[in-house]
């Protein structure tokens, strides 16, 4: 079995790392370069940077931040937020990103995913899906895709959208439960399982990690290939090394 990845996530707005609850109530968490360096030293497998207001604010890419981080951090960087064109993908890769995450722009123009993967390869295109449960209690579970930092409903079914994006060449799906984001109540394992079972590419579970058991559950019960977290790492509750040691004790293969 391939090693499972632990990925700290840095949500960035106006050049600072922030963390919210249910995509709002943002709280400052520090300088992105310092935080990224810390996670590199702790043994993170990758780092994900998301400019969470670039699309809704119509802002350009955070190239200078990525250049600064890439010069000091030597693990893969995934970067998203405000990516609208294949040219944007090129600019971020040139700045030092290893993978590019697209979200709102993939929904506005699904061909972007096809074109970007054709030019740069599936391995560096990640489609981020922000999903909120739309089914009532007792109904078959359904989740709707939201865009623009969780502010805009699309009417799209999250599982079907993940299937389409994988078919268009996306190399990974970054799946965030909006219902669990920042709540520390654990992943939406039903959502994670539904998408993981539906697509032939790796799924990164995101949204809701409150402790180390939640990370392990994302792999063992959610069937994710990687787990992403922010709050438990940003505020010193746990280190990445502690998370890896816990997962190894649970019998999950990780790179120590």
Curated annotation (Swiss-Prot):
Protein's recorded name: Imidazole glycerol phosphate synthase subunit HisF
KW Amino-acid biosynthesis (keyword) present: yes
Active site: 11, 130
Family indicated by similarity: Belongs to the HisA/HisF family.
One GO BP annotation of this record: L-histidine biosynthetic process
Pfam families: His_biosynth
Annotated source species: Cupriavidus necator (strain ATCC 17699 / DSM 428 / KCTC 22496 / NCIMB 10442 / H16 / Stanier 337)
Catalysis performed (reactions): 5-[(5-phospho-1-deoxy-D-ribulos-1-ylimino)methylamino]-1-(5-phospho-beta-D-ribosyl)imidazole-4-carboxamide + L-glutamine = D-erythro-1-(imidazol-4-yl)glycerol 3-phosphate + 5-amino-1-(5-phospho-beta-D-ribosyl)imidazole-4-carboxamide + L-glutamate + H(+)
Function (record text): IGPS catalyzes the conversion of PRFAR and glutamine to IGP, AICAR and glutamate. The HisF subunit catalyzes the cyclization activity that produces IGP and AICAR from PRFAR using the ammonia provided by the HisH subunit.
Keyword terms of this UniProt record: Amino-acid biosynthesis, Cytoplasm, Histidine biosynthesis, Lyase
């Amino acid at each position: 079995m391939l090693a499972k990845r632990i990925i700290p996530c840095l949500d960035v707005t106006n050049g600072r790392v922030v963390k919210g609850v249910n995509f709002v109530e943002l709280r400052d968490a520090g300088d992105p370069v310092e935080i990224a360096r810390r996670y590199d030293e702790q043994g993170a497998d990758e780092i994900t940077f998301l400019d969470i207001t670039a699309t809704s604010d119509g802002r350009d890419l955070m190239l200078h931040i990525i250049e600064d981080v890439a010069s000091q951090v030597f693990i893969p960087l995934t970067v998203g937020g405000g990516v609208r064109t294949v040219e944007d993908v090129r600019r971020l890769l040139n700045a030092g990103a290893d993978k590019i995450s697209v979200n709102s722009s993939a929904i506005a123009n699904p061909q972007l995913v096809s074109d970007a993967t054709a030019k740069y390869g599936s391995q560096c295109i990640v489609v981020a899906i922000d999903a909120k449960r739309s089914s009532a209690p007792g109904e078959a579970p359904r989740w709707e895709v939201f865009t623009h930092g969780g502010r805009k409903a699309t009417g799209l079914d999250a599982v079907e959208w993940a299937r389409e994006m994988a078919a268009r060449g996306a190399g990974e799906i970054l799946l965030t439960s909006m219902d669990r984001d920042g709540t520390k109540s654990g992943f939406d394992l039903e959502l994670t399982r539904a998408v993981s079972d539906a697509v032939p590419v790796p799924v990164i579970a995101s949204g809701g990690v409150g402790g180390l058991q939640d990370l392990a559950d994302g792999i063992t019960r959610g069937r994710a290939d990687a787990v992403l977290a922010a709050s438990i790492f940003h505020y010193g509750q746990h280190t990445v090394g502690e998370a890896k040691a816990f997962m190894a004790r649970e019998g999950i293969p990780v790179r120590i």
